[in-house]
């Protein structure tokens, strides 16, 4: 069974996510308009700057459309996408998607110059996976029903809650498609 997964194309490594999804067996498109969501089985919210992405989602009518989409469909957030999916964001008030019962800290590992790579064990994905952290958040706290998939220095950096998957790093920048393959599997199970 083939699934169709969109990548929100407002900011971030859109083409890298599209390539990783295609290499993982999914049909995929760049999503720039809310009407495109209707044809999808899943959606990727890529990295970028979360405040800017939130503003662009509002500007293009995508925020409410994604909240409706999320009621039945799978979503995978990386870095800023994870932040957008969180119920709580440290130091931020106001509406966010609130899809994952998690509390996140933005830029938790430092600024752009503090970006790094680290070998990670990711449950259900890989014993060894190259995590690329760029101004990355981490998950401070998870609620019941949230499965912790990976940690780095005792900080949660990947999780799953039902059909929602999120990570603080950038798997699309590694050339390793195993994390995207896992999302394709989740999307198929949810179809």
Swiss-Prot record:
SUPFAM superfamilies per the record?
Class I glutamine amidotransferase-like
UniProt keyword Isomerase, yes or no: no
For this chain's UniProt record, which GO biological process terms are given? Answer: glutamine catabolic process; pyridoxal phosphate biosynthetic process; pyridoxine metabolic process
Query: Which residues are named in the active-site annotation?
Result: 79 (nucleophile), 170 (charge relay system), 172 (charge relay system)
Write out the pathway annotation from the protein's UniProt entry.
Cofactor biosynthesis; pyridoxal 5'-phosphate biosynthesis
Which of this chain's residues are annotated to bind L-glutamine? 48-50, 106, 134-135
- The source's domain of life comes to Bacteria
Gene Ontology terms, MF aspect: glutaminase activity; pyridoxal 5'-phosphate synthase (glutamine hydrolysing) activity
Listed under catalytic activity are:
aldehydo-D-ribose 5-phosphate + D-glyceraldehyde 3-phosphate + L-glutamine = pyridoxal 5'-phosphate + L-glutamate + phosphate + 3 H2O + H(+); L-glutamine + H2O = L-glutamate + NH4(+)
GO cellular component, as recorded: cytosol; glutaminase complex
Key words, A-Z:
Glutamine amidotransferase, Hydrolase, Lyase, Pyridoxal phosphate
Parts forming coiled coils: none
- What family is it from? Belongs to the glutaminase PdxT/SNO family.
Q: What does this protein do?
A: Catalyzes the hydrolysis of glutamine to glutamate and ammonia as part of the biosynthesis of pyridoxal 5'-phosphate. The resulting ammonia molecule is channeled to the active site of PdxS.
Which HAMAP family does this UniProt record tie to the protein? PdxT
Q: Quaternary arrangement and interactors, per the entry?
A: In the presence of PdxS, forms a dodecamer of heterodimers. Only shows activity in the heterodimer.
Instruction: Return the protein name.
Output: Pyridoxal 5'-phosphate synthase subunit PdxT
């Amino acid at each position: 069974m083939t699934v169709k997964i969109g990548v929100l194309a407002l900011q971030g490594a859109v083409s890298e996510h599209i390539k990783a999804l295609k290499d993982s067996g999914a049909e995929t498109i760049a999503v720039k308009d809310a009407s495109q969501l209707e044809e999808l089985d899943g959606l990727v919210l890529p990295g970028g700057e979360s405040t800017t992405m939130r503003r662009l989602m509002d500007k293009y009518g995508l925020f409410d459309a994604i909240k409706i989409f999320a009621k039945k469909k799978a979503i995978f957030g990386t870095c800023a996408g994870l932040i957008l999916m969180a119920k709580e964001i440290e130091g931020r008030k106001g509406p966010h998607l609130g899809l994952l019962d998690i509390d996140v800290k933005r830029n938790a590992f430092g600024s752009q110059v503090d970006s790094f790579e680290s070998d990670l064990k990711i449950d259900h994905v890989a014993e060894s996976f190259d995590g690329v952290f760029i101004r990355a958040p981490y998950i401070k706290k998870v609620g019941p029903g949230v499965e912790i998939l990976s940690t780095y220095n005792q900080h949660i950096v990947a999780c799953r809650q039902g059909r929602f998957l999120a990570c603080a790093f950038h798997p699309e920048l590694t050339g390793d498609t195993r994390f995207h393959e896992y999302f394709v599997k989740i999307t198929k199970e949810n179809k």
